[in-house]
Amino acid sequence: MSGGSADYSRDHGGPEGMEPDGVIESNWNEIVDNFDDMNLKESLLRGIYAYGFEKPSAIQQRAIIPCIKGYDVIAQAQSGTGKTATFAISILQQLEIDLKETQALVLAPTRELAQQIQKVILALGDYMGATCHACIGGTNVRNEMQKLQAEAPHIVVGTPGRVFDMLNRRYLSPKWIKMFVLDEADEMLSRGFKDQIYEIFQKLSTNIQVVLLSATMPMDVLEVTKKFMREPIRILVKKEELTLEGIKQFYINVEREEWKLDTLCDLYETLTITQAVIFLNTRRKVDWLTEKMHARDFTVSALHGDMDQKERDVIMREFRSGSSRVLITTDLLARGIDVQQVSLVINYDLPTNRENYIHRIGRGGRFGRKGVAINFVTEEDKRILRDIETFYNTTVEEMPMNVADLI
């Protein structure tokens, strides 16, 4: 495949279309700010609105159209911008629903993200009758083979190792796959999946449409775009376009760290009006807080990276279904949680780096869905909060007494 427009330029040693600091320049200016104007199938539109989307996010306004038109697309966007739905909608629009063959393949760096993408695709494609299978490690290979052989799902989403394995053993046929999506490409490459990704490309048709999404654009990501993409459309969603819109942000002054627990317990009634996610900075603290809350007879569930896959799945299932209402977790899993009903996020600890702030609270009010974020702030935290306000050009106000009315 020709590398398209990414030839190296002399000025700053980076590929053309790149600024020196690893940010791509957009070469596509068309913006469609309404799902109704995208010429989507009626059944897909129903799925989009039923899912709770009202208007497209910045990346959706820009990237859905070129994806649907069949262009190769590179989109630089953080998580929390609505990128999953961007490629989910693009895939679903291009599906031939009566063709019972796999027509799109999506790669993601982690099992959680792959399962999350699968859920979004199934929800958006619900009225179309689209089928989607998650092909991930940590599950039974034999079951997977039987599943893929029994009926080919329209869409396969998975982690590179397992997807390559299924292609290699010919349980997953590349014959009808016309769209290949790499989500969080920077993450996949930094986790050492480069060889598998290259091998997967070798097994796919040479004129396949490639859509690559990445928060950052390091050399190894650019190498993939240069090698496997043809004259790609480049779309950059800048930080300030990440949405804090519609999210009311508050802080509560908590004089001392040890008083946070009582503050949280006082808020508990408010939390359970809907569903809430509480973020802490360490796994140990997640366990500690969960125990303390249980000891006081509050119902909460906890999720962190030390738990095994089965346990994590059960907890997420309970939370998604609404049978558990308060989830305590760490940043590690912030990216894997996108639950419709979450309209309240509590930062028990402020995030250690400011980028994570949007990953956490971007959950609460995505895409026109409103949300409330409450930050617990000690004396030492005030500087961090000011830093966050400056970084996102936003204001965090003291929490009013009637916060329950806002949720």
UniProtKB/Swiss-Prot annotation:
Species classification: Eukaryota, Metazoa, Chordata, Craniata, Vertebrata
UniProt motif DEAD box: location: 183-186
RNA-binding among keywords: yes
Organism: Gallus gallus
The name this protein goes by in its record: Eukaryotic initiation factor 4A-II
SUPFAM superfamilies assigned to the protein according to its UniProt record, in alphabetical order: P-loop containing nucleoside triphosphate hydrolases
Region annotation (Disordered) ranges: 1-23
Motif Q motif per record, residues: 33-61
Function as written in the Swiss-Prot or TrEMBL entry: ATP-dependent RNA helicase which is a subunit of the eIF4F complex involved in cap recognition and is required for mRNA binding to ribosome. In the current model of translation initiation, eIF4A unwinds RNA secondary structures in the 5'-UTR of mRNAs which is necessary to allow efficient binding of the small ribosomal subunit, and subsequent scanning for the initiator codon.
Reaction(s) the record says it catalyses: ATP + H2O = ADP + phosphate + H(+)
Protein family (similarity comment): Belongs to the DEAD box helicase family. eIF4A subfamily.
Superkingdom of the source species: Eukaryota
Keyword vocabulary terms for this entry: ATP-binding, Helicase, Hydrolase, Initiation factor, Nucleotide-binding, Protein biosynthesis, RNA-binding
Known EC number: 3.6.4.13
Quaternary data: eIF4F is a multi-subunit complex, the composition of which varies with external and internal environmental conditions. It is composed of at least EIF4A, EIF4E and EIF4G1/EIFFG3. Interacts with EIF4E.
Keyword Hydrolase belongs to the record: yes
GO function terms (MF aspect): ATP binding; ATP hydrolysis activity; mRNA binding; RNA helicase activity; translation initiation factor activity
Pfam family, one: DEAD
Domain Helicase ATP-binding: 64-235
Record-listed ATP binding positions: 77-84
Location of the Helicase C-terminal domain: 246-407
